[in-house]
Amino acid sequence: MKKIALLADGWRRYVIYSWVEGIMGGSKELGLDVCLYFYNTNGTWSQDSKFNKGEYALNDLPDLNSFDGVVFDCTNTTNLDEIQYMVRKLQSVNVPVVSIGYKVDGFY
């Protein structure tokens, strides 16, 4: 079984449900056994910087090296420092990373 982490920010449930359904459905069509771990922060929803910092701290909880791959979406992240922090973190792991909406050398 392949373990995939999906990291996203600020999406509401209908959009993310479609992503999970698409990833899992596509995996099944390809005959792949995938377990998807979804981490969705909401650091863009508040004017309270401490709240936002706490939300983004959730991204530090998973050991990303324990996954077979990571899907990274920061299209709703408005804090450039947070995007750059996550990019550096993802560049330091030894698994493939697919980046949605943000071009990073070395990511797919």
Question: What positions do the PLM features span?
Answer:
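Alpha-helical recognition/docking segments in bacterial nutrient-uptake
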Residues: 1-108
